[in-house]
Design a protein with these regions (language model features):
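Short loop/turn motifs at secondary-structure junctions and domain boundaries
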Residues: 47, 113-118
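Regulatory sensory and allosteric helical modules in signal-transduction proteins
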Residues: 58-61, 65-114
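Sensory-domain boundary capping and coupling elements
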Residues: 127-140
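Juxtadomain coupling helices with adjacent low-complexity linkers
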Residues: 2, 20, 24, 140-163
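Intrinsically disordered, low-complexity terminal regulatory regions
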Residues: 1-73
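Short hydrophobic/aromatic beta-strand element in the GNAT-like acyltransferase core
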Residues: 52, 123, 135
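A short, aliphatic-rich beta-strand micro-motif
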Residues: 120-127
């Protein structure tokens, strides 16, 4: 597939239905993880225009006894580099191994404010062999931006990525 996206307007579901096979086309045959994560976030950011889209990858910590989430490929304003397990929305999604939709980040206990512009968030864990190995984090400057449609399609998108 050419490295171009066909950006469409329409309902959120229609946009995802158009984007999903395009992301699959970008990932097919590419084995480099960074390239695949980068193209995935670029495609999502280009289609939806969200404030921030990126991955945090579970890695060994140099100065902390446990693994932590380390910033991976992203698009948007500069971001927090490391997140400990159980901290913030990303760390909570990691611990719970489930997608978290946060309509208002100010009301999420322990929210880590990497950007004061962010108003709502969805975090989707990437699970392989029963373990969370990364999370996809998406932030919006609008309250209540994300719903179960986003959850359904973003979970499908992270399943496409080979780790």
């Amino acid at each position: 597939m050419a490295e171009d996206l066909s950006i469409i307007t329409g309902s959120k579901q229609e946009q995802y239905q158009s984007l999903l096979p395009q992301i699959k086309g970008l990932l097919d045959g590419e084995t480099d993880l960074v390239a695949n994560l980068a193209n995935t976030v670029a495609a999502l950011k280009e289609q939806f225009g969200w404030l921030w889209v990126g991955f945090y990858i579970v890695k060994k910590s140099f100065d902390y006894a446990q693994d932590e989430l380390v910033l991976g490929p992203f698009q948007g304003p500069v971001a927090c580099t490391r997140i400990r397990k159980g901290k913030g929305v990303c760390g909570s999604s990691w611990v719970e191994a489930k997608t978290l939709i946060v309509p208002d980040v100010e009301k999420f206990p322990g929210h880590i404010a990497c950007s004061s512009i962010s108003k709502s968030e969805i975090v989707v864990p990437v699970i392989r062999n029963g373990n969370v190995i990364a999370v996809l984090d998406v932030d919006s400057e609008e309250l209540d931006q994300f719903d179960t449609t986003d959850q359904f399609f973003l979970e499908k998108i992270v399943e496409l990525i080979s780790f």
